[in-house]
Amino acid sequence: MVRNLEDFCNEANAKHIRIEDRERYTGHFNALKDMVYSYWKKSKGLDKLVKGTTLCGGYGDNLKVSKPDEYDLLIHLVFPENDKIIVKADASNPGNVLLDMTKVMEIIAKQEHNKPVFDLLQKIVNNKKQLLEDKLQSFLHGIMTQTLNKMGNRIEVQGEISHLSYKKCGPAHNILVKGPCEYSVDFVPAIKLSAAQLVLAPEQRKHFGGTLYWDAVPKPMKPAKPDNPSFRTSFYEAERSLLHGKQNLKSAIRMIKHIRNEKNKANLKSYHIKTVFLWQVMEKDASYWEKPKKEILIEMLGKLADLLALTPRKGRLPYFWDPKLDMFADLTDDQRTDMFNCFRKCEYVFRKADGNLNDDNENSVHSSFKGSGRNGQKMEKTSTESEQKKPTETKPNAKVESTPVKPNPKPSVQEKQAKPNLADQKKCTKNANGTKSKTTTPKPS
């Protein structure tokens, strides 16, 4: 019997925010990851660039909730003479950088063993020798298409066949798996750069700390722009360090993500939530995260609502690594109003329950974590996107070995309800840091 709100938060973490079939899904994912990676490593030109992967997103941060049906994988690309890439901030696009390959090309033009890379670069840079996002992605799209064709658009794991479909979505190359395990993987290419190549402002440079590497992700502009030299910065490793060791921080993030999923607020991306907490890590003393989960949850729900508020000057969510970029800029007023009302109401419900967790208040809190209350009442739908609810995030067990893969057989023959936005329902969206989203419509990731 739950006796107070803190007990309820602990129970919610144990009962509702859990991973089912973790090992089975992880083994299957590892098999697919290894096979795709091996084909990329065999591709002419790309073979010299591919230098490892990083599991990121909810799994990498240990922030995923619910089913293990969505993975984000950075595929690191490192050019010969990579440290000679001249990185400049893109003044026209906050949070983005330009990659000047002039010195790299001057050196490798004289190296016979790097001729395939030089030939590739000649096709994917402009007349200023700046690397072009769309040209690089077009090349990788061809590689991934060939990869799926060679695999017969299927994979066999432990004697069971799963069918694969591929689509390009934002910066990600997404593979949807249908079979005994159904999930999707975003393969996100990322140019791996060193700390010496940072172009951060002094304050943000301080947050980067002792991290050795960061990435430039070929994220398309909105709308798509041909011959685009602008790449989105990504600081996954530095962010992981900033969130590490903050006792109840990750529990609070998981609870907010779970509430978002249950309320079907797919326009609020996981990276939005993560960014709210990154800013709070800078503002709060380390001891703050040792407070009870309920206190952190209530305050963070309030912070989130404040940022979504349509005030005369509008709330905004600055990108942690370049505050000139507002991560809420692409949201419509209806979307913001819908989410503001949702999270402000949740804040009110939790504050009320914290003062008096009677049966009615407990049922209201319960409804925030599940689709129905204790007595089985159906939770009122709070979003016009309720039919597009997307599953949530958690970290796979790193100790699970990749499952053996057999060769593939040949294929057999403020209170207004936001209005539905059909364009939003159809388009692919990505994590605001440029490394996912993920890929269904619209994706909460």
From Swiss-Prot:
Q: What is its EC number?
A: 2.7.7.-
EC main group: transferase
Name any cofactors this protein relies on.
Answer: Mg(2+); Mn(2+)
Residues annotated as binding GTP: 186, 232-239
This enzyme catalyses: GTP + ATP = 3',2'-cGAMP + 2 diphosphate; GTP + ATP = pppA(2'-5')pG + diphosphate; pppA(2'-5')pG = 3',2'-cGAMP + diphosphate
Q: How is its activity regulated?
A: The enzyme activity is specifically activated by double-stranded RNA (dsRNA).
Give the function comment from the record: Nucleotidyltransferase that catalyzes the formation of cyclic GMP-AMP (3',2'-cGAMP) from ATP and GTP and plays a key role in innate immunity. Synthesizes 3',2'-cGAMP in a two-step reaction through production of the linear intermediate pppA(2'-5')pG. Acts as a key sensor of double-stranded RNA (dsRNA), the presence of dsRNA in the cytoplasm being a danger signal that triggers the immune responses.
Quote the protein name from its UniProt record.
Answer: Cyclic GMP-AMP synthase-like receptor 1
Q: Where does this protein come from, organism-wise?
A: Drosophila erecta
